[in-house]
């Protein structure tokens, strides 16, 4: 199971990512942030090269997040197994959740954020993350952590497909 959120503070322009996974070394493979450019989370049969590639397209070629994501996914194989979320320095978002992502999976864009997850108890986990981010006042880190807490609460209150 992996769930993540990329977000931006509209007041400061600060970018950030919060991610949790059952996979080892998730922090070395999945979250990518470049100050003044954007944030990218790659997960589910992840290809770590996608993060820097998308950030390079945002920065060097001045592509919008959707175009950068499409180009990066188009140049790599196995995209249907991946989940990728992107936010740029202007707060524009893009997301991809391949049909072959593991278990119940979902990806949702919100105001200044985008979240995704796989092997979930249900799609409501990601929806709750976005709602928590949007409804929590304060600094970006507080909003990212509120989103993670919302997901964790649902993990322990929602029936899991593996429980049957």
Locations of the language-model features?
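Alpha/propeptide regions of enzymes that mature by internal proteolysis
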Residues: 1-155
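Conserved small/polar residues in nucleotide/adenosyl-binding loops
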Residues: 156-163
